A protein has these predicted regions:
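Loop/turn elements at helix/coil->beta-strand transitions in domains of secreted/extracellular proteins
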Residues: 119-122, 147-152, 178-181, 216
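Thiol/selenol-based redox catalytic cores and closely related redox-interacting motifs
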Residues: 46-47, 57-61, 65-87, 162-237
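Residue-level recognition of beta-strand->loop/alpha-helix junctions
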Residues: 155-157
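Short active-site neighborhood of thiol/selenol oxidoreductases, capturing the structured segment around
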Residues: 114-135, 150-153
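Glycine-rich adenosyl-nucleotide cofactor-binding module
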Residues: 97-123
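Sec-exported extracytoplasmic/periplasmic mature domains
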Residues: 42, 136, 142, 146-149, ...
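N-terminal targeting signals for export/organelle localization
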Residues: 4-6, 13-101
Length: 244
């Protein structure tokens, strides 16, 4: 969903109210704008409003999304704030923090997990059973585990609801042994069974959409960073070490 046209409409709606107030008085009106936005966005339950590194701007975290709003309530800014002195993408750091906060509230039981004997890093993979590079990643699952990388799979059928890939994901996540079923599905083998009403495929897919994921595999690191595409085991380990 494209949230920013909606934000612009909301700001136009409230502009006659917020433009006449001082910074402190504007907080209530800014909250009204953001509360309305929460009702529109899927998977968004709350927001945080903080002073940004730029004077006169609030930083707003809505899930993993980051926007900026002027303290007088007149201006909405979408984009990246770069700290040139320290070579840091301030906005992406805030996004990463938001992703981690969202993931902390997610039950691991909804995922399919491959765990090493000793975990040094944890990654969450948004995967599509019919994606070629997702299958390539899974073919090497033991190599990732040998490097101490815990792999948590979430379902993200790229073709969307009511498609063959979506149905395959439902069969896998509804099976008695999800890992075995996923192994079979990733090998192109048929997985039969019943589709359970409480399967997490839709909620996983919606979360991926909130994170603006469009391709698979997408790797979410334990620092909240997104890596789009396949990485071989050693390359992924190197990226994870660099983040630390």
């Amino acid at each position: 969903m494209q949230i920013f046209p909606l934000l612009a409409l909301l700001l136009l709606f409230y502009s006659d109210v917020v433009s006449s107030n001082q910074d402190e008085d504007n907080l209530q009106e800014i909250d009204a704008v953001l509360q309305t936005l929460l009702e529109i966005l899927p998977g968004a339950n709350d927001y945080t409003l903080d002073d940004s590194v730029v004077e006169g701007l609030y930083s707003v975290n809505i899930g993993s999304e980051v926007i900026y709003i002027s303290k007088d309530g007149k201006f909405l800014i979408r984009g990246e704030i770069l700290d040139l002195e320290n070579s840091i993408n301030v906005t992406e750091e805030k996004r990463s923090q938001g992703r981690l906060e969202v993931m902390e509230n997610l039950d691991e039981k909804t995922m399919i997990i491959y765990e090493p004997k000793k975990t040094t890093h944890t990654v969450t993979i948004f995967t599509d059973i019919d994606c070629g590079y997702c299958r390539k990643f899974h073919e090497q699952i033991d190599d990732y585990l040998d490097l101490g990388i815990k792999v948590r799979y979430m379902s993200f059928p790229r073709t969307g609801p009511n498609t063959e890939s979506w149905e395959k994901a439902q069969y896998v996540w509804c099976s008695k042994d999800r890992s075995i079923s996923l192994d079979r599905a990733k090998q192109g083998k048929k997985v039969d069974g019943d589709i359970c009403l409480d399967n997490p495929v839709e909620s996983h897919y919606n979360l991926g959409s909130v994170f603006n994921i469009s391709g698979t595999p997408t790797i979410l690191t334990d620092k909240g960073k997104l890596i789009v595409g396949y990485l071989p085991p050693q390359s992924l380990l190197l990226r994870l070490k660099e983040e630390n």
